[in-house]
Amino acid sequence: GVIPCGESCVFIPCISSVVGCTCKNKVCYRD
């Protein structure tokens, strides 16, 4: 995960996980 998805995942999971984003350091990233 190197590209920020512009979404945080402090309280809820990454909604953007449907496009390959994963939670890292409270922020959603994708490869």
From Swiss-Prot:
Any idea which UniProt keywords this protein has?
Disulfide bond, Knottin, Plant defense
After translation, how is this protein modified?
A: This is a cyclic peptide. Contains 3 disulfide bonds.
Question: Which SUPFAM superfamilies does this one have?
Answer: Cyclotides (SSF57038)
Q: Note whether Cell membrane occurs among the keywords.
A: no
InterPro entries linked: Cyclotide, Cyclotide_bracelet_CS, Cyclotide_sf
Q: Which cysteines are joined by disulfide bonds?
A: 5-21, 9-23, 14-28
* Chain positions of cross-link Cyclopeptide (Gly-Asp): 1-31
* Keyword Isomerase among UniProt keywords: no
What GO biological process terms are annotated to this protein in UniProt?
defense response
Q: What is known of its domains?
A: The presence of a 'disulfide through disulfide knot' structurally defines this protein as a knottin.
What job does this protein perform? Probably participates in a plant defense mechanism (Potential). Binds to and induces leakage in phospholipd membranes, particularly ones containing 1-palmitoyl-2-oleophosphatidylethanolamine (POPE).
Annotated family: Belongs to the cyclotide family. Bracelet subfamily.
Q: What is this protein called?
A: Cyclotide mech-5
Question: What organism does the record attribute this protein to?
Answer: Melicytus chathamicus (Chatham Island mahoe)
What is the taxonomic lineage of the source species?
Eukaryota, Viridiplantae, Streptophyta, Embryophyta, Tracheophyta
